[in-house]
Regions:
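N-terminal strand-loop element at the rim of the active site
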Residues: 7-13, 26-79, 88
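A charged, aromatic-enriched C-terminal amphipathic alpha-helix characteristic of glycosyltransferases
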Residues: 76, 367, 371-404
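Donor nucleotide-sugar binding/catalytic pocket of nucleotide-sugar-dependent glycosyltransferases
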Residues: 132, 145-226
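Conserved donor-binding/catalytic core segment of Leloir-type glycosyltransferases
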Residues: 194, 221, 229-247, 253-257
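Acidic donor-binding loop of glycosyltransferase active sites
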Residues: 237, 298-312, 325
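Nucleotide-activated donor-binding/catalytic signature segment of Leloir-type glycosyltransferases, i.e.
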Residues: 273-295
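Short hydrophobic beta-strand element within catalytic cores of glycosyltransferases
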Residues: 317, 326-329
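Conserved acidic donor-binding segment of nucleotide-sugar-dependent glycosyltransferases
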Residues: 341-342, 346-353, 361-367
């Protein structure tokens, strides 16, 4: 099978790129012929593989482009990338080739989606965010710090400044979304999507194409199995991620300070000083490598995951479970699906400081932390999340379903044409 993987970056700059690269390499290891289509270098070392051809348009992503006008146009419609994709797909056998779309909004643009659709090769798209529907890809009102329930591109949406920057940026995103829908034909002509959580499918169900098939694929977490940690032996709670408002870091800082709980923030971001003001005793590590972040996890009482928006999963929660650390997660986040409330961790009401404080207070009980952590560990290592081979087998099964559905559609179309010709 030939697999065309489409992603803005060819290196790991976030969870989506990590998944795209892991899957591409895993499929290549299984003997599939993989083309990795991207816009931005550098190329990850893992992609240097005998069964992988990297096709790069050699461009900037939108934020790093020194030419703002060029970035403005490229973000709406990347003509160069569309041409490269169109040329690549011209001579491929559509009966044994599949296009797997990941992220295209930061460099490649919806032009590559339209070029893919024009090839008539079967397509599947992983929903790493909500960009198929929402102009900001988040369903989140940043100034109000709350989940947005407005219909995307409705008059109410257009008049609402929900952007993380300013209203002018929101209007640019609206333009991009309109072009994606009307010229890029996304999502209306995409018939297969992959989700990593039920919540992602539920949020998107009203915006996908009629008849679109939603395939659930448990994400794989790269983690080496070691004995479970001992959360009962430590008092410090830990947060891993970017220090930005929508991730709920100030909520976490205020709650921990009120309960006199030590809290370590592993990450960097613009809210570092506000966090220090909210919790003067909090430790902020700045950026650290993966091995160091794992050490912070293993010496924590619990992971706090206070995100204010939906999220499409919450990979760090799975990583905490892999080491036997319980997690505190909001009830509006997809992370609630991987934390069994009162069994492998605790849920709290999203944005509710009093409820978060109460749940943190519960986890001051070392015995409870130990029981929840061990249950999280056992649950993780008995699930598909811990097996790359299971993940790849499930992905191949999805590909086979997509190809079979396309063949059935072709057969129906041919039959209809034959009936018409007889008439």
């Amino acid at each position: 099978m030939k697999v065309i993987v489409v992603n803005d970056n060819a290196h790991v700059n976030g969870g989506a790129a990590k998944v795209a690269i892991q899957e591409a390499v895993g499929l290549a290891d299984r003997g599939h012929s993989v083309y990795f289509v991207c816009a931005v270098r550098p190329i990850a070392q893992a992609l240097i593989h005998s069964n992988i051809n990297v096709v790069c348009s050699e461009q900037y992503d939108l934020l790093s482009n020194p030419n703002q006008f060029d970035a403005f146009i490229q973000g709406w419609w990347n003509t160069k990338a569309a041409h490269i994709v169109g040329q690549l797909l011209t001579d491929l056998d559509r009966t044994n080739t599949i296009i797997h779309l990941h992220v295209w909004t930061r460099a490649l643009s919806a032009s590559v989606v339209r070029a893919s659709l024009a090839s008539d090769i079967p397509i599947v798209c992983t929903l790493h965010d909500f960009s198929l529907a929402c102009p900001t890809a988040t369903f989140f009102n940043h100034p109000r710090q709350q989940i947005c329930h407005l219909d995307p591109l409705s008059p109410a949406c257009l008049l609402t400044n929900c952007d993380t920057r300013n209203y002018a940026q929101k209007l640019w995103r609206v333009g991009r979304q309109f072009i994606q829908q009307q010229i890029g034909h996304a999502p209306r002509d995409i018939q297969h999507v992959i989700v990593h959580s039920k919540l992602a499918g539920e949020v998107m169900q009203h915006y996908l194409a009629p008849g679109c098939m939603v395939h659930n694929l448990p994400v794989y977490i790269e983690s080496t199995r070691s004995p479970p940690a001992h959360p009962e032996a430590h008092e410090t709670f830990v947060y891993l991620g970017r220090l930005v408002r929508e991730k709920g870091v100030l909520l976490a800082a205020r709650s921990a300070a009120a309960e006199n709980i030590p809290l370590t923030f592993v990450g960097s971001g613009p809210l570092a000083e506000e966090i220090r003001a909210a919790h003067p005793q909090a430790c902020i590590t700045g950026w650290v490598d993966h091995a160091t972040s794992v050490n912070y996890l293993r010496t924590a009482r619990a992971l706090i995951f206070p995100s204010m928006w939906y999220e499409t999963l919450g990979l760090v929660v799975l990583e905490a479970a892999a080491h036997g650390i319980p997690s505190l997660v909001p009830d509006t986040s997809a992370a609630r699906e991987i934390v069994l409330d009162g069994v492998t961790g605790l849920h709290f009401r999203s944005g509710d400081e009093a409820d978060l404080r109460a749940k943190m207070q519960q986890l001051k009980d070392g015995n409870l932390a130990r029981v929840l952590g061990r249950a999280a560990y056992d649950h993780f290592w008995s699930s598909n999340y811990s097996s790359l081979e299971d993940h790849l087998s499930s992905l191949e099964n999805i590909y086979r379903k997509v190809l079979a559905a396309e063949r059935t559609e072709d057969t129906i179309l041919v039959s209809q044409l034959e009936v018409q010709s007889v008439r």
